Amino acid sequence: MAEAGTGFLEQLKSCIVWSWTYLWTVWFFIVLFLVYILRVPLKINDNLSTVSMFLNTLTPKFYVALTGTSSLISGLILIFEWWYFRKYGTSFIEQVSVSHLRPLLGGVDNNSSNNSNSSNGDSDSNRQSVSECKVWRNPLNLFRGAEYNRYTWVTGREPLTYYDMNLSAQDHQTFFTCDSDHLRPADAIMQKAWRERNPQARISAAHEALEINEIRSRVEVPLIASSTIWEIKLLPKCATAYILLAEEEATTIAEAEKLFKQALKAGDGCYRRSQQLQHHGSQYEAQHRRDTNVLVYIKRRLAMCARRLGRTREAVKMMRDLMKEFPLLSMFNIHENLLEALLELQAYADVQAVLAKYDDISLPKSATICYTAALLKARAVSDKFSPEAASRRGLSTAEMNAVEAIHRAVEFNPHVPKYLLEMKSLILPPEHILKRGDSEAIAYAFFHLAHWKRVEGALNLLHCTWEGTFRMIPYPLEKGHLFYPYPICTETADRELLPSFHEVSVYPKKELPFFILFTAGLCSFTAMLALLTHQFPELMGVFAKAMIDIFCSAEFRDWNCKSIFMRVEDELEIPPASQSQHFQN
């Protein structure tokens, strides 16, 4: 019964929509017929006579005031439309027309197949939008105590936003905690410490967790019925407490490395114990997964400490071993740390080997992947590249490949070239980035600018070719060339990730639509004419009559036609014979 009732309502709705679409002319004539029949009771003739008498008594000042009032209202609407466009990036009138008026006027297709297809398309686009606007952990993030806090001490500015630090707190709770933490006092304290907003409270909680592990517990072991001995047993160290102290309390990279080494000893022991018990139940499996994340994080940060302290080869070895030991943990993006370290060693063959593995169509892209591939191809031709020579003889195959790689990288993240070419000042990278956004561009350029400078001519090639990308994608928000359309949400997310003193790079730049500019000019011109006509009616009448006489005069028409013909002749001018023979030779 319910399905029959629903089907009847759908049929009734479709009939009403069809009647509005095709029978509106019949309805219009019916209304006119009713008005004609009821003209005597409604006194339509008398009302029309009254209206005509009222219009005949109006003075020109009324029309001037009416024009000024309409211009004022149009100006207010224009201001509101401009504000709405600046804030939300779309026209309010257009949005209301498409979202609300179009369905009421029958602009929605009722075919079930079309609806299903459109819903599938919308879900795909929404899914793509969500994946594009996902915030990722920065694989090259700095140390809070040794780097971010030192910047704050020197400049007095906060390089991290609250939103960024809140995301880091959520990551720490996901990676470093599990449901069984309440069974161990130190882990229970650290579970609360990761939720603390105050840095000093977090550091104090980490020290408290380490102090609990120093308490010695006595275990009574009966040997015989008449005697016992006491065994002194130390509780295992808390690895996550050392991680927090290394990240936030250590003021130098050397101190952080020392604390991470202590964390490695504790974390390795916990990992081995949980590895043996992981098959005993879901609780032990979750604990082993947590211990695995802790161990991988510690080893990765130790490799980054070695990279910061100049031991680059040691850092590369640690990263390679870590990727071999845990090949499935791609959430940390260790290969991007490896690429940066290999570029520092100028081991370009090894960089190409890593790119061959990770620059795959099925894997998610990043600015590091795309721009490193462009750097390697630019390195082969950049030292001999000259824009003048290329314009004369054309691009060679290698140069064309390099230019295409640069265009591919710029399409993925168009903000990076401004930082590599030092057209925009760099800041400390955030702890989280948005792929294809300004935050990712800052994180990439902060570490890779030196590698581009080291390759002779690479920045020159980038400077000459990167803007050509935008000619291939005139509407980047609607259609891309090699990637999906550029996501709309990057500006909003980057403003939350980057500090307020940084000017966020916006792509594509929002330009006011032509109808807003045209409406602004028309309203301003009309209001000015109304004001001048109200103040100087006789003078404006003479001016209007003179302008009409000028436009209607024969001299004006002849001059306009001559100017048009002269311009066409200039455009179609044929070069002299000598010059044509020179080009033929």
UniProtKB/Swiss-Prot annotation:
Q: Indicate how the chain sits in the lipid bilayer.
A: Multi-pass membrane protein
Q: Which InterPro entries match?
A: ST7 (IPR007311)
Q: What is its main location?
A: membrane
Task: Look up the domain of life of the source.
Answer: Eukaryota
Give the positions annotated as glycosylation sites.
Answer: 47
- Transmembrane segments annotated in the record for this chain: 15-35, 62-82, 512-532
Q: Which GO terms describe its cellular component?
A: membrane
Keywords linked to the UniProt accession: Glycoprotein, Membrane, Phosphoprotein, Transmembrane, Transmembrane helix
The reply on keyword Glycoprotein is yes
* List of residues that carry Phosphoserine: 386
Places the protein is found? Membrane
Q: Could you identify this protein by its name?
A: Suppressor of tumorigenicity 7 protein
- Which species is this UniProt entry from? Callithrix jacchus
Organism ancestry = Eukaryota, Metazoa, Chordata, Craniata, Vertebrata
Gene label: ST7
